[in-house]
Design a protein with these regions (language model features):
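Intrinsically disordered, charged and Pro/Gly-enriched terminal/linker segments
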Residues: 10, 26, 46-50, 74, ...
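DNA-binding alpha-helical recognition surfaces that contact promoter or target DNA
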Residues: 39, 56, 63, 210, ...
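Short amphipathic alpha-helical recognition elements used for nucleic-acid or partner binding
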Residues: 9-41, 61, 187-195
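DNA-recognition element of transcription regulators
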Residues: 14-22, 47-68
């Protein structure tokens, strides 16, 4: 997380300041109540003077955000009867730009523009992986709840983008990325299926089958379940070398994407 104003770095360094600012940004232009601040900052064990501490943090945060110009900061971080509100203009928050690019990328995929859509989704994902993801800010229950749907949406967009790139014949370029993604979630069936296909198309049948066995083991150990029928069908096709798994011969998205696994979430 970073904050800049006219080229000057205004990013808070103290963990509580960063956490408070993250909560305000995730609720930009909306009032964050004192109760919400207390729950986020201290969860189940607030100090006796938690409300007073919040007021102090806000005062300090105002100074940080505007280099000591508290009068200016009060116009940005506004006091309300129930709590505080952070005013954010259009284009100021990277999260909003990230979400805009995500929507535009998906729209391009829907319109049959896989190359342009995939590029835009990659740009959006790079923004999230860089500064938008709040990776260096502490997160309490409210921030975790706010970030969860964004992370789900990000994963869904990644699956769609890779789906398009596989259909464009970019399997070799995708192997390393898919290995890293699957390593982060060993039970994710769609990403594993995409990894299996990318490996198979890259001439690595044994590695593709090994990816299936790792998925089956992880699902059994972590979720007490087994891979779905689509993954089993893909595994059979890999074992038999079914022609439908062959990579596309042109740089255009084929009329049918049956060769690219699209699994239905349980």
């Amino acid at each position: 997380m970073s904050v800049t104003e006219n080229g000057d770095d205004r990013t808070p360094s103290a963990p509580k300041h960063r956490q408070m600012l993250a909560l305000l940004l995730m609720n930009a232009n909306q009032v964050v109540s004192m109760a919400q601040f207390v729950e986020e900052l201290w969860e189940y064990s607030p100090p006796p003077r938690a409300v007073a501490a919040v007021h102090t943090y806000v005062m300090q945060l105002r100074r940080i955000l505007h280099g000591g110009a508290t009068a200016v900061a009060c116009g940005r971080l506004v006091t309300r009867e129930q709590g505080y509100l952070l005013r954010v203009e259009d284009g100021e928050l990277d999260l909003h730009l990230y979400e805009s690019r995500l929507r535009a990328g998906r729209a391009l995929l829907d319109a049959g523009e896989p190359d342009a859509g995939a590029r835009l989704l990659r740009t959006a994902d790079a923004m999230w992986s860089g500064t938008t993801g709040l990776v260096d800010a502490p997160t309490g229950p409210l921030l975790r709840a706010a970030l969860a749907p964004i992370e789900r949406e990000r994963t869904e967009a990644t699956v769609r983008r890779i789906h398009a790139e596989l259909a464009l014949g970019r399997h070799q370029e995708l192997v390393s990325e898919l290995c890293a993604l699957v390593h982060q979630d060993l039970t994710h069936e769609e990403l594993t299926a995409q990894l299996m296909l990318a490996l198979y198309r890259s001439g690595r049948q044994a590695d593709a089958l090994a990816a299936f066995h790792r998925l089956r083991h992880a699902l059994r150990e972590d979720l007490a379940t087994t891979p779905g029928p689509d993954v089993h069908r893909l595994t059979t096709d890999i074992l038999t070398g079914h022609p439908r798994l062959e990579p596309p011969t042109t740089g255009h998205l084929p009329l049918t994407l049956d060769a690219v696994p699209t699994l239905v979430a349980a």
